[in-house]
Amino acid sequence: MTPPSGVAGQGQGSGLPRRAPCLTGDPGFLHQESEMHVPTTAIRPQLDIRAQAPVPTKHGVFQMLVFHFGGTTSPDQGLSPDHVALVMGDVRGRSDVTLRVHSECLTSEVFGSLKCDCREQLEAAQAEIGRRGLGVVLYLRQEGRGIGLANKIRAYQLQAFGHDTVDANRILGLPDDARGYEPAAAMIEHLGIESIRLLTNNPDKVDALRALGVRIASRSAAIVPANPFSAPYLEAKRLRMGHVIPSLRDGEGAAVGDAE
């Protein structure tokens, strides 16, 4: 029987890895046939690799790496110190690598909430990387722009009474955006990426990553179709948080494409 086409790290859609990863030699190291050799010991202060395995998706097979970053632990807000890199292809030493830094959104990504575009942005990023056969999604566990799930749902309740996403946070005494990108910068450094093509609509994210030493060769828009529930939220991000997106008052957005 002919084996399935594609191997881990290639954007072949239905391709599967030829062999699952196995432990060899020193148990402190994980070895994969794709030649991704990842130590479980500390990479830099506060950052550790905990696990690695190929994960088949409808967009191709990604290598999933689980990083533990102690500096992001906020148990009072329910934030996790464990972050994920989904890697397709050999990105080490590469320039202009398509990359999305994506923050966790339980409400949309698990339960299908229509109040934001997070789920669609994540899906679009994976699809684009799959088409290119090379790229990275960094999934940061900082729910609700870093305020945690409980505070996010409290903000949702205020939004139900007519407050936008910014005012809801402020009424609760919370910052507009509490996210930090130190884990993302550390993961990019560990993966050996020279420079990135960042998928984002958020200029503040660009500035924050550059301040942490990440080389951003270009920025590409991450715009997906809106809906009547997400349009007010996205409009608030455009008008009050400086996101580079078209006006969505009509409830419609554009397809993912390169920014100027």
Model-inferred region functions:
Residues 29-260:
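Catalytic domains of riboflavin
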